[in-house]
Amino acid sequence: MRFTENFERAKKEALMSLEIALRKGEVDEDIIPLLKKINSIENYFTTSSCSGRISVMEMPHFGDKVNAKWLGKWHREVSLYEVLEAIKKHRSGQLWFLVRSPILHVGAKTLEDAVKLVNLAVSCGFKYSNIKSISNKKLIVEIRSTERMDVLLGENGEIFVGEEYLNKIVEIANDQMRRFKEKLKRLESKINALNR
């Protein structure tokens, strides 16, 4: 398989890109130890990652990422006050409160390596993990969990929900954040099993 032949070069390129991103402060700090562990394993390398986030986003319509604007973004638990401050910045389009679980893309040397990683990730609670793509250049595993939240808060400067409701969704979001951060810790503690 060509992706196996190209593995060493792809890993070298990915590690160089990660080093640049680390220097620029573009990598979520709490996921760095896990990335380093994965990258230290001979048959794997990370290509992109997010440790999970809570956000408030303004966009012309749902799904328009190109024209979307972050009003608040956190890779940690968030307070109601922080969310309210982000909401105050809303002017036009739709206003969304979003939770996204962690996502990691990992290159694997062989199909067997990819399957081992998917099985490990699923056993750690990342139920949506899968083999994302197979090409001549790379074999990519996507590690992803189930936590997600999409709540429309307002549109064109008008807010549809009250503070009591916002407080409840912030509580739920923080609960999801704690849950997926625990899954990341579990994965980090078990990732060395791939060395066997």
Swiss-Prot record:
UniProt-recorded name of the protein: tRNA(Phe) 7-((3-amino-3-carboxypropyl)-4-demethylwyosine(37)-N(4))-methyltransferase 1
Top EC class, one word: transferase
Listed InterPro entries: Taw3, tRNA_yW-synthesising, tRNA_yW-synthesising-like_sf
EC number of the protein: 2.1.1.282
GO biological-process terms attached to the record: tRNA methylation; wybutosine biosynthetic process
Name of the gene: taw3-1
Species: Pyrococcus horikoshii (strain ATCC 700860 / DSM 12428 / JCM 9974 / NBRC 100139 / OT-3)
Keywords: Methyltransferase, S-adenosyl-L-methionine, Transferase, tRNA processing
Molecular function terms, GO-annotated: tRNA methyltransferase activity
UniProt catalytic activity: 4-demethyl-7-[(3S)-3-amino-3-carboxypropyl]wyosine(37) in tRNA(Phe) + S-adenosyl-L-methionine = 7-[(3S)-3-amino-3-carboxypropyl]wyosine(37) in tRNA(Phe) + S-adenosyl-L-homocysteine + H(+)
The UniProt record lists the keyword S-adenosyl-L-methionine: yes
One Pfam family per UniProt: TYW3
UniProt xrefs under PANTHER family: TRNA WYBUTOSINE-SYNTHESIZING PROTEIN 3
Function as written in the Swiss-Prot or TrEMBL entry: S-adenosyl-L-methionine-dependent methyltransferase that acts as a component of the wyosine derivatives biosynthesis pathway.
Family listed: Belongs to the TYW3 family.
Key word Transferase present: yes
Lineage, top ranks: Archaea, Methanobacteriati, Methanobacteriota, Thermococci, Thermococcales
